[in-house]
Amino acid sequence: MVFTAPCWVPPLPSDLPDSTTLEEFIFCQVKDSQTRSELDRSILICGTQGREYTVQESMERTGRLAQGLSAWLNWPQKSPGKDWKVAAIFNVNCVDFFSISHAIHRLGGTISAINASSTADELEAQLRLSNAQAIFTCNTLLKIAMKASQRVGIPLANIFLTDAPGSYRPDDVYPFQEIDNIVRTAKSSLPLLQLGRGQGASTPAYICFSSGTSGAQKPVLLSHQGIIANIVQINTFEKFRQKGPNISLCILPLAHSYGLVCVAYSALYRGDRLAVLPSSGVEDLLSIVEKLKINTLYLVPTLVSRILSGGKAGRHDLRCVKEVYTGGAPLHPMLGEHILRHHPTWKIKQCYGATEAGTAVSVTSDCDLWPGSVGCLLPGVQAKIVKSDGSETTKHDESGELWVSSPSLAIGYLSNPLATKTTFTVDNTGKTWLRTGDEVKICLSPNGNEHLFIVDRIKDIIKVKGFQVAPVELEQLLLSNDFVEEVAVTSRQDEGEEERPQAFVVRSQVGLEEPQGAVAESLHALVKARKARYKWLHPHVIFVDSLPKTTSGKIMRRALRNMSPANSEVNSRLSSKI
């Protein structure tokens, strides 16, 4: 049984461009659609320094940067081919992310987007995997970038800074090139790159790394056409709600496909003004929202929780906020209810996707909000649910692994044909299906629309005496206890070598006032009263100061499972290194 978008969703245009770069598709389209009075309206806003760029200013900055980099790196402008050029952006969020990306694209190159929280070892590994030959970074990350680049053989001359003068210098010996200086001294502007027919689908615009929550990180190749397709899918789905330009906030890492595609590029394509902000404290975030009167927030569940804790949101005028999108990890229904209690006018929407899918697969619609679901399928997306025996589901409410086909699918994994073949399956009609690894079910809402519900990661399912236990099910129950701020459930063997659900708990303020033993007893009693015996927790509840998470908010269960049994005491604490 193949599932598609609801009938009321407009169809996806059949003529998606296959010879157009991202920059040309988005900025030229926005520029052409602007009226004379809108030409001077900024579309990019730096949330920290206040700098703003119009479409024309952004494209001019990109062209001059491309010309300067071409001369500095000896990278002539030419269509992508065997001489593949890759530059890494290892930086906090900044408006120059787009100038750098599009400048490298004009040279026929690809951007490897690397998370700013990476250590030198992690950065080294990702530079090697992506074959990067240059790095764009900032003052605060320069030492890490230097260490990793020296290990992989990237010359110091190929490290570029996005910050103003006054940056870190090792003994003031090496004069690192700064983006502003390259733009200022460029003698001309390099034009847009003209791709040949079909090159949009075969040319990687970005290398984004999969989350690595259930294994080693893999470099995912996202093509120009694939990203364009996902942008069009999202905006086609949302067309009926659009009422003119919006102001959106991008605080999620641009190195992650959720922040890059769903937030930034989709907002720019809509004609929104996009405020770009590095990851910062909640107070700074809320101050920017209040100051710029941000209408749409794109968050991850952990950031939502931080905003609501301690009454922080109540100290700011947030009446400008109309809707909040969450993605990257499931939003617990109780957290959604908490938001609506404090901000009843906000529309809470979830979206679901994967880097390998080109990002978004489903989004919540204004016309059918259903708490707990991650929305309806986007136009152009086909989905099927495959059970453990290999058969497809034939009705609603049956769970299994989600397989997705979409024009936005990634090209595959870089230099890993085995992983690509395993994850991207081609059927007997020649159609490619992405095996997501997520256990899901599709249910009919009271309004008659098909909604996607995430059950859990298949690899995270716990098997107890032959029965399957979804960690998310227990986590949602445990979160209903007032003593719990956050919780993660993984598997652990008991004394009889049987798997049992193991709870890792971050206590709330109320919970911190109670003895750990009393909190543990309360949690055991709750599960025993509400769940079947095979779902009962392992006797030891592990209390931690924080849960290890990816930047998108996903709990890193693998890190929790790797904790040694010696640490599995009621009063144990997670190492600060996790």
UniProtKB/Swiss-Prot annotation:
A motif (Peroxisomal targeting signal type 1) lies at residues 576-578. GO terms for cellular component: peroxisome. The keyword Ligase applies. Pfam families: AMP-binding, AMP-binding_C. It is found in: Peroxisome. ATP binds at residues 210-218, 350-355, 438, 457, 554. Coiled coil: none annotated. Keywords: ATP-binding, Ligase, Nucleotide-binding, Peroxisome, Virulence. Residues 351-413 are annotated as: SBD2. Belongs to the ATP-dependent AMP-binding enzyme family. Gene clusters encoding host-selective toxins (HSTs) are localized on conditionally dispensable chromosomes (CDCs), also called supernumerary chromosomes, where they are present in multiple copies. The CDCs are not essential for saprophytic growth but controls host-selective pathogenicity. This is Acyl-CoA ligase AFT1-1. The gene is AFT1-1.
